[in-house]
Amino acid sequence: MPNQHMEELNDQQIVRREKMAALAEQGIDPFGKRFERTATSGQLKEKYADKTKEELHEINETATIAGRLMTKRGKGKVGFAHIQDRDGQIQIYVRKDAVGEENYEIFKKADLGDFLGVEGEVMRTDMGELSIKATHITHLSKALRPLPEKFHGLSDIETIYRKRYLDLISNRESFDRFVTRSKIISEIRRYLDAQGFLEVETPVLHNEAGGAAAKPFITHHNAQNIDMVLRIALELHLKRLIVGGMERVYEIGRIFRNEGMDATHNPEFTMIEVYQAYADFHDIMDLTEGIIQHAAKAVKGDGPVNYQGTEIKINEPFKRIHMVDAIKEITGVDFWQDMTFEEAVALANEKHVPVEKHYTEVGQIINAFFEEFVEETLTQPTFVYGHPVAVSPLAKKNPEDPRFTDRFELFIMTKEYGNAYSELNDPIDQLSRFEAQAAAKELGDDEATGIDYDYVEALEYGMPPTGGLGIGIDRLCMLLTDTTTIRDVLLFPTMK
């Protein structure tokens, strides 16, 4: 079968391959070998930021850099170029009489996109730009394809997501955003590690989807001839570790949900879940606030965070309000009073709140009211707590009012950023809630989970009172990088 890739070479690609062959003929490996640099562009700019042209000439310091050739100009015996490394770009100044004829030819024949190593004197041009006056140039790797025309800022959205490497080369803003993402995750780890939490890894392949209400991806294990699912949450395995005595655990991992895609949803995404023995949801509220404020401070500094023109007071204590009070504040409807399911449905109809066919409890109506009227008002960081039992199958009932649970969700800019509760550690209650979920599944609720008997058995060995938390890392990264779509914080988002 002919190689279609080879048949489609355009003129530029042919010329680049010819140059590759010419390098090989000269005894130069077109794809280079190990190269030792002494500094990055950023380190040089930082080190010599306050040095004038004259001072640099007097110091006469040399440096060796390496990176991708991004611009090149000049003719005859003198040339200027920009080399790009992980910190950004730095100019190089190449003179034929300084590097020698053979070495100057390597520079002259280099194409944009090629990798070069440059050794030379640190200087400042008459225009004040910090540069390297080359004394030697090393060819490090040949680029066989030219960079996209607009390499100063790739603008084609499809290419940005499909060929992230081109986006990273051409869009510094995008590159920096992903560096920030990594920093956010590192800071969260540092914060939890300092408080005695242990980072663990749990299985991605599960026998039964659990720990969340979501449709799973189903796969098949050939050797055991069993269907398995990709995890939709981290929860149930982490709580088994609390049973095992680990007391403080967390996991940062990929989650898979076979659901729709939009600006804030991708089929695979990153979550952190944290579990702390002997804590309740009030302690976990404090922990959540600490995690988010610590991450924000690390990448944004002290003070509020600006998101799409709105000032988010992330540095101040987060508001805390019961779900029923929040609904009452906005709609005037009081769900504190006892009511039948029929009365709740009548209220929903009166207020034009959709009632799904699988609803059988007042709690589901309360949650629907919250989603319909309250969520869109929650701009500043707000902990909404006291979710109904009907929508919280893994959370502990509130001892004062068992219709509700000791659970909270964190909302910022109308979106949910975290979900947490005092964990249900009563195996009998847990089994009955699993059974209710299984019944809802039978009634057509696609997101209801099945029964995890192994988890119930684990609880029967005893689990201490525990607080647990889940935070969507991608949404947090969107907030802290002022980004409107999840695809801009995922290096390789899911594409058709």
UniProtKB/Swiss-Prot annotation:
<dbReference type="InterPro" id="IPR006195">
    <property type="entry name" value="aa-tRNA-synth_II"/>
</dbReference>
<keyword id="KW-0479">Metal-binding</keyword>
<protein>
    <recommendedName>
        <fullName>Lysine--tRNA ligase</fullName>
        <ecNumber>6.1.1.6</ecNumber>
    </recommendedName>
</protein>
<dbReference type="GO" id="GO:0005829">
    <property type="term" value="C:cytosol"/>
</dbReference>
<keyword id="KW-0963">Cytoplasm</keyword>
<keyword id="KW-0436">Ligase</keyword>
<dbReference type="InterPro" id="IPR018149">
    <property type="entry name" value="Lys-tRNA-synth_II_C"/>
</dbReference>
<keyword id="KW-0460">Magnesium</keyword>
<dbReference type="GO" id="GO:0005524">
    <property type="term" value="F:ATP binding"/>
</dbReference>
<comment type="similarity">
    <text>Belongs to the class-II aminoacyl-tRNA synthetase family.</text>
</comment>
<dbReference type="InterPro" id="IPR002313">
    <property type="entry name" value="Lys-tRNA-ligase_II"/>
</dbReference>
<dbReference type="GO" id="GO:0140096">
    <property type="term" value="F:catalytic activity, acting on a protein"/>
</dbReference>
<dbReference type="GO" id="GO:0000287">
    <property type="term" value="F:magnesium ion binding"/>
</dbReference>
<keyword id="KW-0547">Nucleotide-binding</keyword>
<keyword id="KW-0648">Protein biosynthesis</keyword>
<dbReference type="Pfam" id="PF00152">
    <property type="entry name" value="tRNA-synt_2"/>
</dbReference>
<dbReference type="InterPro" id="IPR012340">
    <property type="entry name" value="NA-bd_OB-fold"/>
</dbReference>
<dbReference type="InterPro" id="IPR044136">
    <property type="entry name" value="Lys-tRNA-ligase_II_N"/>
</dbReference>
<dbReference type="InterPro" id="IPR045864">
    <property type="entry name" value="aa-tRNA-synth_II/BPL/LPL"/>
</dbReference>
<dbReference type="GO" id="GO:0004824">
    <property type="term" value="F:lysine-tRNA ligase activity"/>
</dbReference>
<dbReference type="GO" id="GO:0000049">
    <property type="term" value="F:tRNA binding"/>
</dbReference>
<keyword id="KW-0067">ATP-binding</keyword>
<feature type="binding site">
    <location>
        <position position="416"/>
    </location>
    <ligand>
        <name>Mg(2+) 1</name>
    </ligand>
</feature>
<feature type="binding site">
    <location>
        <position position="409"/>
    </location>
    <ligand>
        <name>Mg(2+) 1</name>
    </ligand>
</feature>
<dbReference type="Pfam" id="PF01336">
    <property type="entry name" value="tRNA_anti-codon"/>
</dbReference>
<feature type="binding site">
    <location>
        <position position="416"/>
    </location>
    <ligand>
        <name>Mg(2+) 2</name>
    </ligand>
</feature>
<dbReference type="InterPro" id="IPR004365">
    <property type="entry name" value="NA-bd_OB_tRNA"/>
</dbReference>
<dbReference type="GO" id="GO:0006430">
    <property type="term" value="P:lysyl-tRNA aminoacylation"/>
</dbReference>
<keyword id="KW-0030">Aminoacyl-tRNA synthetase</keyword>
<comment type="subunit">
    <text>Homodimer.</text>
</comment>
<dbReference type="InterPro" id="IPR004364">
    <property type="entry name" value="Aa-tRNA-synt_II"/>
</dbReference>
<dbReference type="GO" id="GO:0016740">
    <property type="term" value="F:transferase activity"/>
</dbReference>
